[in-house]
């Protein structure tokens, strides 16, 4: 099995799941035990600055402006009460996992305090919940043509507007995902 860690999953138009419809998921982990990822294009309608306020983590003014423009994302249907911060590597927070390619996933409160202050990661996404797959489940969904995959890029992850991530990710494959058949074939 080839790991798809540090890849994007792009939902096929035929994916019959209202939660994952037109989703782009960054895969944080993928091994023979399963997979874990964060949906990167489904904003919840909450600014990061509001989340910081709700957690009694006041943001300094300059950094409050950055946090106000950032949206909290619906990271997936699993553990929606848990926060996940996907960010560029800076090694001084608790509960951080190095994902490679200059990215980290942090689940501790201290990274949110940093986002409100002077130690904020250069680029970050804040999500509630994650997407998870059991052993061989993702491989089965890939075989069923539910997802397309591409290597992850920081540009798509951090610089493209949420609503543009799915069409841009599908176009990066060289075609429009709407033109792909939902049926798998064998020659």
From Swiss-Prot:
The protein's name in its UniProt record: UPF0301 protein Sputw3181_1330
Family annotation (SUPFAM superfamilies): VC0467-like
InterPro entries, sorted: AlgH-like (IPR003774)
S-S bonds: none
Cited HAMAP family: UPF0301
UniProt cross-references to Pfam families, sorted A to Z: DUF179
Sequence similarity: Belongs to the UPF0301 (AlgH) family.
Lineage top rank: taxon: Bacteria
GO cellular component labels: cytosol
């Amino acid at each position: 099995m080839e790991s798809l860690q540090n890849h994007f999953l792009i939902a096929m138009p035929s994916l019959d799941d209202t939660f994952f419809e037109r989703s782009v998921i960054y895969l944080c982990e993928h091994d023979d035990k399963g997979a874990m990822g964060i949906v990167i294009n489904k904003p919840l309608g909450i600014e990061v600055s509001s989340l910081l306020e709700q957690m009694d983590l006041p943001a300094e003014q300059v950094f409050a402006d950055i946090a106000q423009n950032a949206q909290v994302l619906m990271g997936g249907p699993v553990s929606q009460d848990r926060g996940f911060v996907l960010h560029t590597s800076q090694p001084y927070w608790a509960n951080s996992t190095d994902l490679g390619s200059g990215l980290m996933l942090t689940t501790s409160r201290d990274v949110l305090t940093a986002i409100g202050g002077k130690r904020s990661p250069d680029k970050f996404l804040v999500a509630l919940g994650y997407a998870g797959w059991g052993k061989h489940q993702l491989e089965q969904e890939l075989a069923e043509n539910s997802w397309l995959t591409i290597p992850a890029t920081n540009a798509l992850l951090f610089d493209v507007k949420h609503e543009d991530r799915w069409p841009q990710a599908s176009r990066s494959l060289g075609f429009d995902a709407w033109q792909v058949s939902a049926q798998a074939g064998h020659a």
